[in-house]
Amino acid sequence: MTASQRTLMVMAGGTGGHVFPGLAVAHRMEAAGWRVVWLGNPAGMEATLVPKHGIPMEYVRFGGLRGKGLKTKLTLPFNLLRACGQSLAALRRVRPDVVLGMGGYITFPAGVMTALSGRPLVLHEQNSIAGLTNKVLAKFAKRVLVAFPGALPHAEWTGNPIRAELAGTEAPKARYAARSGPLNVLVVGGSLGAAALNEVVPRALAMLTPGERPRIVHQAGAKHIEALKANYEAAGFAAGEDVRLVPFIDDMAAAYAAADLVICRSGAMTVSEIAAVGVAALFVPFPYAVDDHQTSNAAFLADAGAAVLVQQRDLSAELLADWLRGQSRASLADMAERSRSLAKPEATDEVARVCAKAAGANLETLQ
């Protein structure tokens, strides 16, 4: 670190939905010459993932209360006090010019201590329904940013920071016009899989005639791939050129861009990535998400005719088969264009600019 180099502290952890957008901003700031330090939980995924990106870590131990037992709730005051002390110590060691909160349990004690220490705090809410931590911290933050309009009062709509390759894909109109033959459908269950999709999609395909069936790429998560293969075999399909079953996908930008339709859950980053690429989507929100935020995330696109939203309780093989019969590449291309029009491809740069400005930096350092 040089005497003139400014420092950004990113506080985020727990899930990829918090960590990956934080990493996108961190790398953008590093490219502009900033020093970046990450504040996370030693038990979270960030403790393993972030150091692989060459970013130094500071740690705070703090967990959530939802669904926890009486013992956890009784020890909350002690754990919160300890986390506040750890947060203050980290802030004193790092001495950041600005702190960016991207979500996760540790954001609460660290955000409180950031505000009390007089350092500028920038918050970013990834979901369409803000969590309790950000609702509280928004009262003390210098700038409040949201991925979906209306998630927090008096906030700036920047979108979700995403990987550059997702924002740089060819326009939907050109991609769809270049294709012929069966529709290309990508089914994404995520790293944990989505049992409802894994069961319903094969049965829906079996209800279609050979001429109606799309080509399928179905990602199920490593723990669910064998069960997925069994589901397709039970429906009369063997993995081959028209049915590809995979545990994970390395290049999601290419997978999204090659699809005419994506069938998936509606986590914040998934919705943002689909809009950035511009691809039609059928969202099946995870029914047990906190505050049912996945339904609200999906509705952002669905209400604009840019996607279709089906609740898991309503999803059936019959419904999916009937809906697929009614789709054409042209209708899906129209949906994809609407989706792309709602994207915020400059989100990473915009969040970085806000952080720089909050620290009193010249925005020309983020060219």
From Swiss-Prot:
Pfam families: Glyco_tran_28_C, Glyco_transf_28. GO terms for biological process: carbohydrate metabolic process; cell division; cell wall organization; lipid glycosylation; peptidoglycan biosynthetic process; regulation of cell shape. It catalyses: di-trans,octa-cis-undecaprenyl diphospho-N-acetyl-alpha-D-muramoyl-L-alanyl-D-glutamyl-meso-2,6-diaminopimeloyl-D-alanyl-D-alanine + UDP-N-acetyl-alpha-D-glucosamine = di-trans,octa-cis-undecaprenyl diphospho-[N-acetyl-alpha-D-glucosaminyl-(1->4)]-N-acetyl-alpha-D-muramoyl-L-alanyl-D-glutamyl-meso-2,6-diaminopimeloyl-D-alanyl-D-alanine + UDP + H(+). Pathway: Cell wall biogenesis; peptidoglycan biosynthesis. Keywords: Cell cycle, Cell division, Cell inner membrane, Cell membrane, Cell shape, Cell wall biogenesis/degradation, Glycosyltransferase, Membrane, Peptidoglycan synthesis, Transferase. It is found in: Cell inner membrane. GO terms for molecular function: UDP-N-acetyl-D-glucosamine:N-acetylmuramoyl-L-alanyl-D-glutamyl-meso-2,6-diaminopimelyl-D-alanyl-D-alanine-diphosphoundecaprenol 4-beta-N-acetylglucosaminlytransferase activity; undecaprenyldiphospho-muramoylpentapeptide beta-N-acetylglucosaminyltransferase activity. GO terms for cellular component: plasma membrane. Its main location: membrane. UDP-N-acetyl-alpha-D-glucosamine binds at residues 15-17, 127, 163, 191, 249, 294. It is a peripheral membrane protein. Its EC number is 2.4.1.227. NCBIfam families: murG (TIGR01133). PANTHER family: GLYCOSYLTRANSFERASE, UDP-N-ACETYLGLUCOSAMINE--N-ACETYLMURAMYL-(PENTAPEPTIDE) PYROPHOSPHORYL-UNDECAPRENOL N-ACETYLGLUCOSAMINE TRANSFERASE 1. Belongs to the glycosyltransferase 28 family. MurG subfamily. Cell wall formation. Catalyzes the transfer of a GlcNAc subunit on undecaprenyl-pyrophosphoryl-MurNAc-pentapeptide (lipid intermediate I) to form undecaprenyl-pyrophosphoryl-MurNAc-(pentapeptide)GlcNAc (lipid intermediate II). This is UDP-N-acetylglucosamine--N-acetylmuramyl-(pentapeptide) pyrophosphoryl-undecaprenol N-acetylglucosamine transferase. It comes from Burkholderia lata (strain ATCC 17760 / DSM 23089 / LMG 22485 / NCIMB 9086 / R18194 / 383). The lineage of its organism: Bacteria, Pseudomonadati, Pseudomonadota, Betaproteobacteria, Burkholderiales. The gene is murG.
